[in-house]
């Protein structure tokens, strides 16, 4: 309970504070009449008394005028309105009887982004707008506004939610496709007209405002109920969640692309480091490794054999190898018994009695080494070996390598009878005579390999390998043969492309009648495919149901061509690319909306009171009608009941709300028809008989500005039925059959939607946000959200009422 109170308090203080008790925030308000600076200098408009004296009111007269906001003023309006989904149109007006005119219009070229219109011809208020899918929409609200009386009108738009108030009474509340306020540059703002030639409003307007805020109707009618949160608040929350999901998907896609680019970085130049034996070296840095002089170049270690110097050594020294170094260095020597010994070398001397004495070269003198005793040997004396550098014998097969050796990498230590020596591994050669340092033999560079044609020799440490060139497959370790990807179907050509094998690869070329890069080919139709047709082969269009012809340019009249057999209780009505069976007079649909009209059932006029039989007759229901029967023996008057009033037999009258329809009572039956127009009669009603109006001022100009129509002429323009009536053009949406289905599509160049079973084909879906999708990364997606499929760059997926629909953009593929 407390949470609901807090939420309500929050909504009242923060959501409605700008309206209730605190006035309207000027940054959220567009006062149209004030900003347009209307005055005596404005042609066709003059100031008059209004409904109240608080603000100015203006009379829009029946004269040529151009009430249009300047470019700067219009842009100020649009900065407040652009990309907003919560706003209200407010106006106080008094419209001339029977006038059909535009209250305000925001449009760019022929695209009406927001237009409010009142038709006195058809007694309805219309809202024209464009949705986020860039389709035009018209919402019609039946209401008599053009009655020469004062009215307060407010139209609140909250995302996909519309509320129409008139005189502070909620008249209509609807859920529609969300209007788009993504207004492009060059959009114009008109008041009281659509443009210089059409939609002239006639009457008085006062307090014309646009409030960019929730439930702006409160400013006009403070006592109206408020709701919190609004539809736009809810849409905003869902949108934020979808945006976060989109950010996550885009981030994942960017990461995937970054990984791919990192794999291609070796094609780019950048400073690269080298690592050898745990040490990292920078670009161009050099160092000595054993008998090699190495340098880091572009991330690769390049080594050359070290050239050793040959220095002159001082007296009592000579050149000798030093542990851990490749080149010889000067080292102290000793002369003993006619031989030369280097510092640290030992030698044994045996006395005549067989006693062993050990000497070591130290400080240029052979010095006696004290004996520390020898370990006992476990081999017979015949297997014992005398050593030249030790008084202790060893057994045959002794492991000298385990004691100490100077063999470096790529060199192995080998045991001889009395010492250890170094030997280069297979595939390596010695860098000095003792084999302590060895280098790899590059069999590829020296031609010491066995790789045959169609292969490339790659050197490896101590060996080499033969790899196949691109487009070839391996036969054995040393040879490869040609690989025909076209024959083995190991190519990436489109099914509508031809594969041509080349040396080491293949080429893809689209077949005649198809366009693309070979890996993606699309059929090409020279004249295009109209009315939603699809080009499926060279100059072959697959036409949607209801159209025919090479380019699907011809509408099939299913009604006259006999393709459709409507039920006897229905009439066949042809539509562009479609048809429907409409219940005949005296019948109505039972709610099943069957395509052939089987759901049309008889209206029981007698039971529902929809008959005109007088009280002295008895109503008998008939199939598709009724009969007024006089009881036997009774003298009936033949009078009729119409709109609750008695009409005498033979009486003729004009309908109250339609002065152009004449009704008569004939023996209990009311028959109504349009007034017969006699253009020779000088008193003919030109409103009902506009075709009898000869005045040039009553002509109308077509929306394209090229065709002139006489009063009474009708035409179809952008899925709207238009009529010229005494110089005024009035247009209303073409009637479409009810579409009671979850998924529908509005084919190109058609005016009425059709039902489809596949949600991926649908462009209009009754979005149910409770239905979610689970994408390929197990991320929950809301209905309406879209994302780039993981691991791809050109596959766009969308969640449609729990169904995942994906499509590939061929142009995107070509740009990769």
Swiss-Prot record:
CDD domains: EGF_CA (cd00054), LamG (cd00110). Residues 397-439, 440-481, 482-522, 523-553, 555-601, 602-637 form the EGF-like domain. Gene3D superfamilies: 2.60.120.200, 6.20.200.20, Complement Module, domain 1 (2.10.70.10), Laminin (2.10.25.10). GO terms for molecular function: calcium ion binding; heparin binding; protein kinase C binding. GO terms for biological process: commissural neuron axon guidance; fertilization. Disulfide bonds join 401-413, 407-422, 424-438, 444-457, 451-466, 468-480, 486-499, 493-508, 510-521, 525-535, 529-541, 543-552, 559-572, 566-581, 583-600, 606-619, 613-628, 630-636. Residues 272-331, 638-693, 698-756 form the VWFC domain. Keywords: Calcium, Disulfide bond, EGF-like domain, Glycoprotein, Metal-binding, Repeat, Secreted, Signal. Residues 64-228 form the Laminin G-like domain. Glycans are attached at residues 53, 225, 293, 298, 517, 548, 615, 635. InterPro entries: ConA-like_dom_sf, EGF-like_Ca-bd_dom, EGF-like_dom, EGF-type_Asp/Asn_hydroxyl_site, EGF_Ca-bd_CS, EGF_dom, Growth_fac_rcpt_cys_sf, Laminin_G. Residues 1-21 form the signal peptide. It is found in: Secreted. Ca(2+) binds at residues 440-441, 443, 459-460, 463, 555-556, 558, 574-575, 578, 602-603, 605, 621-622, 625. GO terms for cellular component: cytoplasm; extracellular region; extracellular space. It comes from the Eukaryota. Homotrimer. Binds to PRKCB. Interacts with NICOL1; this interaction triggers epididymal differentiation. PANTHER family: NEL HOMOLOG (PTHR24042), PROTEIN KINASE C-BINDING PROTEIN NELL2 (PTHR24042:SF0). This is Protein kinase C-binding protein NELL2. The gene is NELL2.
């Amino acid at each position: 309970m407390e949470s609901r109170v807090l939420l309500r308090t929050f909504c009242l203080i923060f959501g409605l504070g700008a309206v209730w008790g605190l006035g309207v925030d000027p940054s959220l308000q567009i006062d149209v009449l004030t900003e347009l600076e209307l005055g005596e200098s404005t042609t066709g408009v003059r100031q008059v008394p209004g409904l109240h004296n608080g603000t100015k009111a203006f009379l829009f007269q029946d004269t040529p005028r151009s009430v249009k906001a300047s470019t700067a003023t219009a842009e100020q309006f649009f900065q407040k309105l652009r990309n907003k989904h919560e706003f209200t149109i407010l106006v106080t007006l008094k419209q001339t009887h029977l006038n059909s005119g535009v209250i305000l219009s925001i449009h760019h070229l022929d695209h009406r982004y927001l237009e409010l219109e009142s038709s006195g011809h058809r007694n309805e208020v219309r809202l024209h707008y464009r949705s986020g899918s860039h389709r035009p929409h018209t919402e019609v609200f039946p209401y008599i506004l053009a009655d020469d009386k004062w009215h307060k009108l407010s139209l609140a738009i909250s995302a996909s939610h519309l509320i129409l108030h008139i005189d502070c009474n909620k008249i209509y509340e609807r859920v529609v496709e969300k209007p788009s306020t993504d207004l492009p540059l060059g959009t114009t703002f008109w008041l009281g007209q659509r443009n210089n030639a059409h939609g002239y409003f006639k009457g008085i307007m006062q307090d014309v405002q646009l409030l960019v805020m929730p439930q702006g109707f409160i400013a006009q009618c403070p006592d109206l109920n408020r709701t919190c949160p609004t539809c736009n608040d809810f849409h905003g929350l869902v949108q934020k969640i979808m945006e976060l999901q989109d950010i996550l998907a885009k981030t994942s896609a960017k990461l995937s692309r970054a990984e791919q680019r990192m794999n291609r970085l070796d094609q780019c130049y950048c400073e690269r480091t080298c690592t050898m034996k745990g040490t990292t070296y920078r670009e161009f840095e050099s160092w000595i490794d054993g008998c090699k002089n190495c340098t880091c170049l572009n991330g690769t270690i390049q080594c050359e054999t070290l050239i050793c110097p040959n220095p002159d050594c001082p007296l009592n020294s000579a050149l000798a190898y030093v542990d851990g170094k490749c080149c010889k260095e000067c080292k102290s020597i000793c002369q003993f018994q006619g031989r030369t010994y280097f510092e640290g070398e030992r030698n044994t001397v045996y006395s005549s009695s067989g006693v062993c004495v050990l000497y070591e070269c130290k400080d240029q003198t052979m010095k006696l080494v004290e004996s520390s005793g020898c370990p006992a040997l476990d081999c017979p004396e015949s297997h014992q070996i005398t050593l030249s550098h030790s008084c202790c014998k060893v057994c045959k097969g002794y492991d000298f390598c385990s004691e100490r050796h100077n063999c470096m990498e790529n060199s192995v230590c080998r045991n001889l009878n009395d010492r250890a020596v170094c030997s280069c591994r297979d595939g390596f050669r010695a860098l000095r005579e003792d084999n302590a340092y060895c280098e790899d033999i590059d069999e590829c560079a020296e031609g010491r390999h066995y790789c045959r044609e169609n292969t490339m020799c790659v050197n490896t440490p101590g060996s080499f390998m033969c790899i196949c060139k691109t487009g070839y497959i391996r036969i054995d370790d040393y040879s490869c043969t040609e690989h025909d990807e076209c024959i083995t179907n190991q190519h990436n050509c489109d099914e509508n492309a031809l594969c041509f094998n080349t040396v080491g690869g293949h080429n893809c070329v689209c077949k005649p009648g198809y366009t693309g890069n070979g890996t993606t080919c699309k059929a090409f139709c020279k004249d295009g495919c109209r009315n939603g047709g699809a080009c499926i082969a060279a100059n072959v269009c697959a036409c949607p149901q209801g159209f025919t012809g090479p380019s699907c340019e011809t509408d099939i009249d299913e009604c006259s061509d006999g393709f459709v057999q409507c039920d006897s209780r229905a009439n066949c009505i042809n539509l562009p690319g479609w048809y429907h069976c409409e219940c005949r007079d005296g019948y109505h649909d039972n709610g099943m909306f069957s395509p052939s009209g089987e759901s049309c059932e008889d209206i029981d006029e007698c039971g529902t009171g929809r008959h005109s039989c007088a009280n002295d007759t008895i109503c008998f229901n008939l199939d598709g009608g009724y009969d007024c029967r006089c009881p036997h023996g009774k003298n009936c008057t033949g009078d009729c009941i119409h709109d609750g009033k008695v009409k005498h037999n033979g009486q003729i009258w004009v309908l109250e709300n339609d002065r152009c329809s004449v009704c008569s009572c004939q023996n209990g039956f009311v028959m109504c028809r349009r007034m017969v127009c006699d253009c020779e009669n000088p008193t003919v009603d030109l409103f009902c008989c506009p075709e009898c109006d000869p005045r040039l001022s009553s002509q109308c100009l077509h929306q394209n500005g090229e065709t002139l129509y006489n009063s009474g002429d009708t035409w179809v323009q952008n899925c709207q039925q238009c009529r010229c009536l005494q110089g005024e053009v009035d247009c209303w949406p073409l009637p479409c059959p009810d579409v009671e289905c979850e998924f529908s599509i509005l084919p190109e160049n058609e005016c009425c939607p059709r039902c489809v079973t596949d949600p991926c084909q649908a462009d209009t879906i009754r979005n149910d946000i409770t239905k979610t999708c689970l994408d390929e990364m197990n991320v929950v997606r809301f209905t309406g959200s879209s994302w780039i499929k993981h691991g791809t760059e050109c596959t766009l997926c969308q969640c449609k009422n729990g169904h995942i629909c994906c499509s590939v953009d061929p142009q995107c593929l070509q740009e990769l």
